[in-house]
């Protein structure tokens, strides 16, 4: 059931829409403590191997990235996309009230909760959006 490979959403690729007249943002890389350099290198290699990351030579866009060690010995790979987020067109989406959701569940016998490991990595971006999500490492 769980073979360690990354599943992919089979629907359409996601397109990030930017506001009009924005300029690209290219950050400087965050410094990485020497003690974490090898761990970061291994994590990048792993993400390249499973198809999450792809090496490129240059880009107008770049978000700084770092890792946070977890208690279990693995790391959390974090990219700071706050500057990109400021440039994205917002698509209003009404969040339903909990009370309304509970009313819809009345009479159901089962409830399921799903948690996607590495959730955002399951959704492919269209080629133009991939360029926006470029990361920079030291």
List the model feature ranges, each with a label.
Residues 71-85, 97, 101-122:
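Conserved catalytic palm subdomain of right-hand nucleotidyl-transferase polymerases, strongest
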Residues 5-8, 67-69, 101-105, 113, ...:
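A general structural signal for short secondary-structure junctions and capping/turn motifs
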Residues 1-93, 138:
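Reverse-transcribing Pol proteins
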Residues 85-92, 120-130:
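Cytochrome P450 core scaffold surrounding the K-helix E-X-X-R motif
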Residues 133:
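Conserved P-loop/Walker A NTP-binding site and adjacent catalytic elements of P-loop NTPases
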């Amino acid at each position: 059931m769980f073979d360690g490979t990354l599943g992919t959403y089979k629907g359409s690729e996601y397109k990030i829409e930017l506001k009009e007249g924005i300029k690209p943002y290219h950050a400087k890389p965050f410094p990485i403590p020497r003690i974490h350099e090898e761990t970061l290198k291994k994590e990048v290699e792993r993400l390249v191997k499973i198809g999450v990351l792809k090496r490129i030579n240059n880009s107008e866009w770049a978000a700084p990235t770092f890792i946070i060690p977890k208690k279990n010995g693995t790391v959390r790979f974090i990219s700071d996309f706050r500057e990109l987020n400021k440039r994205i067109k917002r698509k209003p989406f009404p969040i339903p009230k909990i009370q309304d959701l509970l009313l819809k569940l009345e009479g159901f016998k089962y409830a399921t909760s799903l948690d996607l490991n590495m959730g955002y990595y399951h959704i492919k971006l269209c080629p133009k959006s991939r360029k926006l999500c470029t990361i920079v490492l030291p």
